[in-house]
């Protein structure tokens, strides 16, 4: 069996973290006999420097033909905020590949990390939810008008019933993967916004008509933001929300485990009902241009690779083995500086790769 994976390392620490994830995937390959065909392409600032665009047609076509895509990080001060920006490569690939659902889990890879949270350990212990963010609609892709000298600019938040139904089905599917099903939360601003009223009505009807075994609890986004810092376990389960709210709430959630270096993400183009959804996987952290070589935490990217195995490559057991290996490595105190350790990027990657090999051979 072989799987085709496109690598988009990106900028600054991106190539470093992708290299460690590949190291772990190669350990999986050796242990279980599956072949990974890696194809590397440029994205972001690296692509701008080479081709003048943040994502080349060649890279996009390669991604379309792959089983999955693993991305590092894009951006940095070098490329500024001009008309051609590294982040445009990300927006383009999400839209072109129809990656409509962004999944960002928030949990503790090991209880050894509880002390790193900016919130009290007793408040965050047991936090375990996933934010399901609609990724190709809403205000980020709506009509916009720049200031043309009249001192007025505008952005349009727009959603259709099919767009909301599609992301609701993704959230419901994920909730049903547990027995009993996980709690389902929908976040909106229905007390003010027309688009949120359509969102709430559509989510409610979709769950009632298609997933009668589930109940959805609606929460205003500002209230949810407060709950997240006061009592995050109250939101345990699956949280579904629109593009902008999802962007903000998942960034807020990302500080709960104490380091962005721990949090993976998946962007999917279809339900992972056969564990073969096409997806793009990336760490939640940015390109960290201020970090020197060997300093970045590779675990978010390694855990993104674990999600890739489980959701896109139909290698669920191998994905779980990576997650267990990460826990074992953290429990052993092998950590980068962001977690209070003294290990280098490569040392953490080596430790996880060795642990994965051990787990899969047993």
Swiss-Prot record:
It is an enzyme of class 1 (oxidoreductase). GO terms for molecular function: 3-isopropylmalate dehydrogenase activity; magnesium ion binding; NAD binding. Mg(2+) binds at residues 222, 247, 251. NAD(+) binds at residues 76-87, 286-297. Pathway: Amino-acid biosynthesis; L-leucine biosynthesis; L-leucine from 3-methyl-2-oxobutanoate: step 3/4. Binds 1 Mg(2+) or Mn(2+) ion per subunit. Pfam families: Iso_dh. The record marks 140, 189 as: Important for catalysis. Its EC number is 1.1.1.85. Substrate binds at residues 94, 104, 133, 222. GO terms for biological process: L-leucine biosynthetic process. It is found in: Cytoplasm. GO terms for cellular component: cytosol. Its cofactor is Mg(2+); Mn(2+). Its main location: cytoplasm. Keywords: Amino-acid biosynthesis, Branched-chain amino acid biosynthesis, Cytoplasm, Leucine biosynthesis, Magnesium, Manganese, Metal-binding, NAD, Oxidoreductase. PROSITE patterns: IDH_IMDH (PS00470). It catalyses: (2R,3S)-3-isopropylmalate + NAD(+) = 4-methyl-2-oxopentanoate + CO2 + NADH. Belongs to the isocitrate and isopropylmalate dehydrogenases family. Homodimer. NCBIfam families: leuB. Catalyzes the oxidation of 3-carboxy-2-hydroxy-4-methylpentanoate (3-isopropylmalate) to 3-carboxy-4-methyl-2-oxopentanoate. The product decarboxylates to 4-methyl-2 oxopentanoate. This is 3-isopropylmalate dehydrogenase.
């Amino acid at each position: 069996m072989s799987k085709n994976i496109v690598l988009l390392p990106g900028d600054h620490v991106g190539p470093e973290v992708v290299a460690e994830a590949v190291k772990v995937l190669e350990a999986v390959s050796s242990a279980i006999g599956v072949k990974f065909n890696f194809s590397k392409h440029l994205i972001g600032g690296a692509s701008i420097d080479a081709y003048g665009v943040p994502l080349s047609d060649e890279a996009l076509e390669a991604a379309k033909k792959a089983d999955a895509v693993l991305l590092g990080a894009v951006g940095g001060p070098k490329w500024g905020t001009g008309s051609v920006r590294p982040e445009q490569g990300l927006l383009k690939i999400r839209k072109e590949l129809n990656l409509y659902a962004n999944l960002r889990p928030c949990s503790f890879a090991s209880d050894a990390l509880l002390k790193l949270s900016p919130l009290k350990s007793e408040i965050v212990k047991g936090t375990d939810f996933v934010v399901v963010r609609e990724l190709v609609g809403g205000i980020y892709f709506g009509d916009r008008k720049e200031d043309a000298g009249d001192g007025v600019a505008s952005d349009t938040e727009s959603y259709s019933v099919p767009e909301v139904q599609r992301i609701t089905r993704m959230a419901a599917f994920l909730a049903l993967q547990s027995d009993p099903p996980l709690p389902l939360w929908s976040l909106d601003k229905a007390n003010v916004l027309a688009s949120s009223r359509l969102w709430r009505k559509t989510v409610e009807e979709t769950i009632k008509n298609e997933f009668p075994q589930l109940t959805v609890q609606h929460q205003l986004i500002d209230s949810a933001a407060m709950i997240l810092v006061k009592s995050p376990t109250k939101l345990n389960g699956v949280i579904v929300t629109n593009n902008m709210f999802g962007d903000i709430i998942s960034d807020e959630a990302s500080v709960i485990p104490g380091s962005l270096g721990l949090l993976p993400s998946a962007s999917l183009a279809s339900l992972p009902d056969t564990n073969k959804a096409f997806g793009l996987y990336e760490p939640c952290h940015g390109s960290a241009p201020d970090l020197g070589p060997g300093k970045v935490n590779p675990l978010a990217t390694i855990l993104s690779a674990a999600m890739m195995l489980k959701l896109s490559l139909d290698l669920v057991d191998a994905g779980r083995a990576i997650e267990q290996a990460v826990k074992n490595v953290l429990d052993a105190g092998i950590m980068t500086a962001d977690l209070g350790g003294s290990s280098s990027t490569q040392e953490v990657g080596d430790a996880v790769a060795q642990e994965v090999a051990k787990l899969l051979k047993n």
